[in-house]
Amino acid sequence: MNSLSLELNKEQEVLIISDVENSESIINQVKELSKTVTTSLSKEQQQIQNNFDHVIIISSKPFNSALISMYSNLLKKGGKLSIYQTNENETLVNSGMDFLIGGLVDFKATSNSTYKTIVHADKPSWDTNESSTINIPSTSSNNPWASIEGGDRINENDLVSENDKTSKPATTLDDCEVGKTKKACKNCTCGRAEEENQSKPKLTKEMIENPGVGSSCGNCSLGDAFRCGGCPYRGLPTFKVGEKIQLPDDFLVDDI
């Protein structure tokens, strides 16, 4: 048993399957340390679930991973599957995910002088379909708004002072308090007085005969969308610089 390094007791039922020659001594040692030992399975026994505390596989052939689920079903809750192979088997060593999918956890791979590949995996002591009751302590259903509703309410009228009531809206300050017509006040400091004092250019006959010549912005001929606010050509159609502006016959006719 030293080569297997297993911990068995007289209360355990063990299944041991071996294709290695001269394994009778190992089987006899397992019988001495366990309650019962089974060395082969019939088809009917393969369908029995939760039957063994320990399943031991000793083989010189590559392990068939398709049998993992069958061995897992044969194990009782908390049981162990141990695989001993006389040859190195990297595929088995790296198949931890296959064992997990098959229902086994705590996958471990080792080796010793006798067995080049040793794998152990456990069946959980809990069932994947088990459910348990969780006792959640009851909480008091206090009204979360009670502390707010019970407090003193603020009168919204107290938030407005007398100065706030008599002050004029900011929208009336744009015309310097001279009425709806926007004119510069006597002591204007916003720049409106200077704007009103500027002489706006007027359209002359020369400008119509020879339009756009000497334009400072160069956009006069492009139409109102590109003309300055004080452009004398505003309202006139587009034209070519230096060519007389030709007004259509219905230019001064109201559209309505």
Curated annotation (Swiss-Prot):
Q: Which residues bind [4Fe-4S] cluster?
A: 217, 220, 228, 231
Motif Cx2C motif 1 in this chain: where?
217-220
Gene3D superfamilies under this entry? Vaccinia Virus protein VP39
- Keywords on this record? 2Fe-2S, 4Fe-4S, Cytoplasm, Iron, Iron-sulfur, Metal-binding, Mitochondrion
Region annotation (Linker) maps to 137-166
Q: Which cofactor does it need?
A: [2Fe-2S] cluster; [4Fe-4S] cluster
Q: Which InterPro entries match?
A: Anamorsin (IPR007785), CIAPIN1 (IPR046408), SAM-dependent_MTases_sf (IPR029063)
> What protein name does the entry list?
Anamorsin homolog
What organism, scientifically named, is this protein from?
Dictyostelium discoideum (Social amoeba)
Q: What is the lineage of its organism?
A: Eukaryota, Amoebozoa, Evosea, Eumycetozoa, Dictyostelia
